[in-house]
Amino acid sequence: LCIVGENGSGKSTLVKGLLGLITPVRGCVRYGDGLKRTEIGYLPQRTDVQNDFPASVWEVVTSGCRGRGPFLTRGMRQTAQENMALMDIADIRDRSFMRLSGGQQQRALLARALCATRSLLLLDEPVAGLDPVVTRELYEVIAMLHRDRGLTVVMISHDVDAALRYADRILHMAHGATFLGTPDAYRLSPLGMSFAGGESRD
């Protein structure tokens, strides 16, 4: 699911509600399949990430395991190693996180999010500020996690073209209007035609 829409339409607020960081004004948040809030893998916006702390890549990645217990078990270490290998950062595990490129930092943070979950990833603008090549690589990695590992991915993005290319469902949040449906249906919707240049049918 890719969430798109105007600034201030509530996209990030929705994610914070799913994470339990804010309390809904009305209603409640329910998780299916026995999922616990602490078992959600979260990748925040890059502007929300502290880049100047002196932690190694290994320390950043393994911090994603902390929701499962206060101490790193052998299984947690193995999970962290596997996720670092999956993100192609195993060879830089001892490097300082703050010295990494933007793309490497996002891969490390995605590995951390994978350590926290086996089923649901919440990604808030995961490619913001990255160059086009790194952006495409990261989108392919995210698509692989959904396709090959069966992870449910909920991603906020301002990149409508990427949403149409990679998402199974699109949620468009706007002031006074919303859309939820397939990319093809979105292209034909009023919001889709406004934001994505869709074409109406006769």
Where are these regions (language model features)?
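H-loop (His-switch) and adjacent beta-strand-loop-beta switch element
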Residues: I170-P183
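Conserved ABC ATPase "signature" region
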Residues: G75-I92
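Conserved ABC ATPase signature
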Residues: S96-L100, Q104
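Catalytic Walker B motif of ABC-type/P-loop ATPase nucleotide-binding domains
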Residues: L121-D124
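Conserved ABC transporter NBD signature motif
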Residues: P24-T38
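H-loop/switch region of ABC-family ATPase nucleotide-binding domains
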Residues: S157-H158
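Helix-to-loop junction immediately C-terminal to a conserved catalytic motif
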Residues: L19
